[in-house]
C-alpha cells in the first residue's frame, strides 16, 4: 500500500482541483481556468497532468489531490461522469465547489447538480471574467 503525504490541505492550501472533460474540444476552457487560477495565486491540479509512481492508481491519486485542494472548479460541459463523482467527493470533504458549464450544454446537466449556482458561459473569455469574480468573492 502506498501512502500519499499531505503537505497542505483545505483552507491552508493554494491548490485548486479542476474536474472537467479531457477532450481536445475542452482545451481552450481548460487553459482559461488555469490562467485565472495562476493569476490569483492558486496551483491548478488536473489529474491527467500529475505524474505518480506506478503503484498508485488514478483513483487513489484523484482522491488524494481532492483532499489536498482548497477548492474545486468543476466544469460540467460534455457531462463526464467523473466530474459528478469528483464534485460530490469534494462537497463531502466540505471543499467549496465552483460549478461551470457551457451555455449550450447546461440544459443536459443532471438534476442532482443543476440546481447549484453555475457559472454559465458562451466562450473562454466570458468564463475567465466570471470565474475570476467568483473566486475573488467566494474563496479569497
Where are these regions (language model features)?
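Conserved catalytic or regulatory cores that recognize and/or transform ribose-phosphate-containing ligands
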Residues: 1-140
Amino acid at each position: 500500500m502506498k501512502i500519499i503525504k499531505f503537505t497542505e490541505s483545505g483552507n491552508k492550501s493554494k491548490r485548486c482541483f479542476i474536474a472537467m472533460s479531457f477532450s481536445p474540444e475542452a482545451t481552450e476552457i481548460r487553459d482559461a481556468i488555469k490562467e485565472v487560477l495562476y493569476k490569483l495565486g492558486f496551483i491548478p491540479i488536473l489529474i491527467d497532468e500529475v505524474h505518480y509512481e506506478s503503484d498508485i492508481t488514478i483513483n487513489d491519486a484523484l482522491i488524494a489531490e481532492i483532499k489536498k485542494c482548497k477548492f474545486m472548479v468543476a466544469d460540467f460541459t460534455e457531462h463526464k461522469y467523473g466530474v459528478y463523482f469528483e464534485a460530490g467527493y469534494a462537497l463531502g470533504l466540505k471543499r467549496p465547489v465552483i460549478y461551470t458549464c457551457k451555455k449550450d450544454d447546461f440544459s443536459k446537466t443532471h438534476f442532482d447538480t443543476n440546481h447549484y449556482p453555475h457559472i454559465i458561459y458562451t466562450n473562454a473569455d466570458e468564463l475567465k471574467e466570471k470565474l475570476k469574480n467568483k473566486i475573488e468573492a467566494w474563496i479569497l
